[in-house]
UniProtKB/Swiss-Prot annotation:
GO terms for cellular component: nucleus. This is Sex comb on midleg-like protein 1. The modification Phosphoserine is found at S138, S238. Residues 258-325 form the SAM domain. Belongs to the SCM family. It comes from the Eukaryota. It comes from Hoolock hoolock. InterPro entries: SAM (IPR001660), SAM/pointed_sf (IPR013761), SAM_Scm-like (IPR047531). It is found in: Nucleus. Keywords: Nucleus, Phosphoprotein, Repressor, Transcription, Transcription regulation. Putative Polycomb group (PcG) protein. PcG proteins act by forming multiprotein complexes, which are required to maintain the transcriptionally repressive state of homeotic genes throughout development. May be involved in spermatogenesis during sexual maturation. Pfam families: SAM_1.
Amino acid sequence: MMSSSSSEIDVVKTRIPTYDEDDNTVLYAYETKPEFVNKEPNIVSDVSCNTEEQQKTVNDVLIHCQVIYDAMQNLDKKIDVIRRKVSKIQRFYVKSLWTNRKRYGYKKYSYRLAKKLKLKKMKKNEVYESFSYPESYSPTLPVSRCENNSPSNFPRPSFCMEEYRRAEPEEDPILSRTPSPVHPSDFSEHNYQPYYASDGATYGSSSGTCRGNPRADGIHNTYSTDHASAAPPSVARSPFENDRYIEEGSITKHPSTWSVEAVVLFLKQTDPLALCPLIDLFRSHEIDGKALLLLTSDVLLKHLGVKLGTAVKLCYYIDRLKQGKCFEN
């Protein structure tokens, strides 16, 4: 029998004769055609080849997809690392901005401040150049002075005058002249009290030293050093402990030749109420006659800390001193 799945076109039907005549059965033999037998294996082999190629192609595609997926994973990891670093840099930058934050308009004000400081420095340099002399102002040798124990309340200037070198035991010509002896009645009239300085020399002072009249005839502290050496050391000290003895008439010499003590005596005699507070300041800066003539109101106010009224008065007296009118009646 031919199977139901087979087709009559593909087989050859052959009748088989029977030996029993009484039987009506007919037998047929079916054979496959040779063309069908030869063609069927080729079709199967082609189909198998196609499936293998398709499977290989699919495998290649999957492999490439896996490589792409791995590369994307690596890129994601690198991007995460870069983001963390960028965020860390941003936090550090913001923190530095808050810690080093400058006030509003800092550049503008800093420029003005720098310019102001530069101008101030230039002014100081100019003042220093005008007052920095290589030698002493006075042509005479400086006089060794006793140190004042009372501290000065005046501020020191920004510039420093060169300190005098201590000379050998030679005296100022103004101070070395021997005065004429004084009558004993002068001591009772002017309440003279001799005192001893630190170098052993004895000096004198009178209560009438600071007077409004600048003439030299108002000076009465003309006590001889020979007479003063005989005074006992137990005598009370004078209120003007740092004053040097200056002979009568020496203050009337040219102001550029004055020593420091001559300048001090000039302050006492010119205007004791206004200028006596400047004595310690002048002694601390060792202002002699030449330095006195160079003083201006700006130097007195800015660098020596003198008050305005006192500076105006002193400048007025210095101008009169330059004109030679200070000792006129």
